[in-house]
Amino acid sequence: MKRYLFFVSLSYAYPILRPIQSEIWRRGDDVAWFFTSPCDQYLQEGEKQLKTIKEVIEYNPIAVFAPGNKVHDFFPGVKVQVFHGFSIDKRPGRGDHFRIRGLFDIFCTQGSTSTPHFLELEKQYRHFKVYETGWSKTDLFFPLVPKEKNPVPTILYASTFTPGITSTPHLYDEIARLAKEKNWQWLITFHPKMSPEIVEKYKKLANALDNVSFYEGDNNVELLQKADVLLCDSSSIIIEFLFFDKPVVTYKNTSPGNYLIDVDSPKLIEPAIEKALTYPKELMDNIRKYIDSHQPYRDGRCSARILDAVDDFIAKYKGKIKRKPLNLFRKLQTSWQVKYFPFGPRYTASK
């Protein structure tokens, strides 16, 4: 029996990793969860949690899957980056999605907007391999079930937490006005790193109005399915929503395109949403072309390809390609944070 580990730092990891977990179980293998921050309250019955470094080392997984940018290098197993979203060029010129930190053995890419660039980086660095698998979270999307528009239009508002890009301070008054004046239902959800003050402000709005709901949880897929239109700024949830063949209105998107209705003033939000609710044919055609460029897979088997990639890497490349960089400072920093020093006594993790 093969054993795998999920390395989790934020609650957005659940819908990314659970499809992989389902495929692991389908194959008769085992998987456990390890958390670096307190978000284990969303674990479900039957899901296994390892709480200490000692337990992880004794569990001895063959692979560690991380949706985030970091992973403990001293954990057993090949380190697999499965990403927490799509590349949307949120901060043009930064290239955050393609940053190589020397921590991962495998990058599981999504499609033509990410794979070619990572293959170039593979040639440059030579200490990891790239596999185009599609994104595991999209396994939850398919097969798509055609959905009629809601009798009362339903608007999902989601925003990035990134300072200077988030729309939350700028759109609150307009969203509050629309919620009071328009016969629309509002669903609101934010990134786990969103400012607590902002979260509290929008929660109060939801508590005050019957047609506004604030969602905090481990899986936003139901929200994506339920809404007719997404209102956003520059977040990868845009691409997730577009998979459902529905339009997006953005406020000052950092990389606007013909697949979005982008506006630069809160006063333009209302007419933009009204236009989006008509599902204009040209816009919908552009959405479908854009989504195909990000991920061509619609078969619900991205998680299976990810596990196959791990098997292929272990069989062909483990121990045979260039070693990852020493990263001594980062390793010492991590060891100090978790009070584990693998170059000393084997088990020195704090309780």
Task: Identify the function of each model-found stretch.
Residues 5-144:
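Active-site and donor-binding regions of nucleotide-sugar-utilizing enzymes
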Residues 51-57, 194-242:
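Donor nucleotide-activated moiety binding/catalytic core segment of transferases
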Residues 43-54, 76-85, 204-214, 246, ...:
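Active-site regions of enzymes building and remodeling cell-envelope glycoconjugates
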Residues 1-4, 153:
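Extreme N-terminal starter segment of soluble prokaryotic enzymes
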Residues 101, 127, 203, 236-298:
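Catalytic binding pocket for nucleotide-activated donors in carbohydrate/polymer assembly enzymes
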Residues 13-27, 131-202, 298, 302-304:
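Conserved catalytic-core segment of nucleotide-activated headgroup transferases in glycan assembly
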Residues 271, 277-351:
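C-terminal amphipathic helix plus adjacent low-complexity
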Residues 69-70, 75-83, 217-260:
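A donor-sugar binding/catalytic signature common to diverse glycosyltransferases
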